[in-house]
Amino acid sequence: MTSSSVRVRFCPSPTGIPHVGMVRTALFNWAYARHTGGTFVFRIEDTDAARDSEESYLALLDALRWLGLDWDEGPEVDGPYGPYRQSQRTEIYHDVVAKLLTAGEAYYAFSTPEEVEARHIAAGRNPKLGYDNFDRQLTDSQRAAYLAEGRKPVVRLRMPDTDLAWHDLVRGPTTFAAGSVPDFALTRATGDPLYTLVNPCDDALMKITHVLRGEDLLPSTPRQIALYQALMCIGIAERVPEFAHLPTVLGEETKKLSKRDPQSNLFAHRDRGFIPEGLLNYLALLGWAIADDHDLFSLDEMVAAFDVADVNSNPARFDQKKADAINAEHIRMLDVADFTARLRAYLDTHGHQLALDDAAFAVAAELVQTRIVVLEDAWALLKFLNDDRYAIDPKAAAKELGPDAGPVLDAAIAALDGAADWTTADIEAALKTALIGGMALKPRKAFGPIRVAATGTTVSPPLFESLELLGRERSLGRLRSARDQVGSP
């Protein structure tokens, strides 16, 4: 097999909100396809009408597009093996089931769960062992009798009487002993196909060569291999694909990250202001590393280096602090103009409007780019520029606007009132001359009261630049208002 013939797939069910573990799986499949020059197939497994929703389907499209994980075949781009939504492939599955039955690879099973348990108990076995392959040997007359009773059978695959083994690209040689996996259902009693059928069936028909998926699906692999072998017998499959079971993503306290964990929600990270580069970089580290000596890399660098054989089999813990730190580094790496555009779009989306023209907004964006972890942080630093969001924090006032601040504010007001031009350089020169030179104050004592008076907080973008953005009139107005609230020393 040549590298360019590699075909991988990402096949989520449209239920709920995209999960970061699911996105990690999509990323590894996408990166492997791009690294090998192969094909990334996006398929929707929407056979569960009770749980699937159009809203979740659209959320999946939104997630992949936001992350920049483009697909070569799938919804809205089509391809040679469509349709790519399983709900539109029902007739295909019915045809495959019919061929499996005709070839003797599958059979009708009429046993109820209660009957299976009763047989286990009668034989002295654990009643929870699962299906016992009883219906394999039914005669035509027995089947006819069950049908006459009105029973609706399921279709089960006839499992081989041999070990099922494969070389997992992440975990190495893996074997399930003969007889350890019972014959399993391919359809419901209604005739509707089950996931156990449609997933391998679509992989075969779409000529998938490598299945990269979560470790939680490993127990289903022997069933799928057996089905691939049966599909090869009836001319549906060309091969059994190679498998790679990716490590489990853990949350707090080494428990598997679940949909109930806040870190699992992809859109919660986006809403906080993660950028795709930062989130993808971090998710790539959940089971893979580009090198031992650094964790920061671009998506292009990942594509150049990624090999599924290098994925670690050990569970990976989602560390929010590390994810935040990596995102902060990627924000700093952005071109200033790119960052400015992304920040403007983020603030607009979240209803945060700054009373700044484009030029002033660009200045403000550059001031905060190296001071934030996620885009959300920028609003906390810049909202003082809006008069309707400006208020002096009581804790900041208690720290910086005590009686000793009165003379400092008086001197600052006088110095700024006399500044010839309202530029960062002129503001800095005027304040340093008056407060550090004239009053012999240390910078923290000199500028702390001014920062709190002008921005309402002890944490802000650089002071002199902030005053320039505020403008002369608003800056002096806030300083005078703060001075009026400060008592005499």
Curated annotation (Swiss-Prot):
One of its GO terms (molecular function) is tRNA binding. InterPro entries: aa-tRNA-synth_I_cd-bd (IPR045462), aa-tRNA-synth_I_codon-bd_sub2 (IPR020751), aa_tRNA-synth_I_cd-bd_sf (IPR008925), Glu-tRNA-ligase_bac/mito (IPR004527), Glu-tRNA-synth_I_codon-bd_sub1 (IPR020752), Glu/Gln-tRNA-synth (IPR000924), Glu/Gln-tRNA-synth_Ib_cat-dom (IPR020058), Glu_tRNA_lig_a-bdl (IPR020061). Coiled coil: none annotated. SUPFAM superfamilies: An anticodon-binding domain of class I aminoacyl-tRNA synthetases (SSF48163), Nucleotidylyl transferase (SSF52374). The keyword Hydrolase does not apply. It catalyses: tRNA(Glu) + L-glutamate + ATP = L-glutamyl-tRNA(Glu) + AMP + diphosphate. Its EC number is 6.1.1.17. A motif ('HIGH' region) lies at residues 12-22. Pfam families: Anticodon_2 (PF19269), tRNA-synt_1c (PF00749). A motif ('KMSKS' region) lies at residues 256-260. The keyword Ribosomal protein does not apply. It is an enzyme of class 6 (ligase). ATP binds at K259. GO terms for cellular component: cytosol. It is found in: Cytoplasm. GO terms for biological process: glutamyl-tRNA aminoacylation. Keywords: Aminoacyl-tRNA synthetase, ATP-binding, Cytoplasm, Ligase, Nucleotide-binding, Protein biosynthesis. Monomer. PANTHER family: GLUTAMATE--TRNA LIGASE, GLUTAMATE--TRNA LIGASE, MITOCHONDRIAL-RELATED. Catalyzes the attachment of glutamate to tRNA(Glu) in a two-step reaction: glutamate is first activated by ATP to form Glu-AMP and then transferred to the acceptor end of tRNA(Glu). Belongs to the class-I aminoacyl-tRNA synthetase family. Glutamate--tRNA ligase type 1 subfamily. This is Glutamate--tRNA ligase. It comes from Mycobacterium ulcerans (strain Agy99). The lineage of its organism: Bacteria, Bacillati, Actinomycetota, Actinomycetes, Mycobacteriales. The gene is gltX.
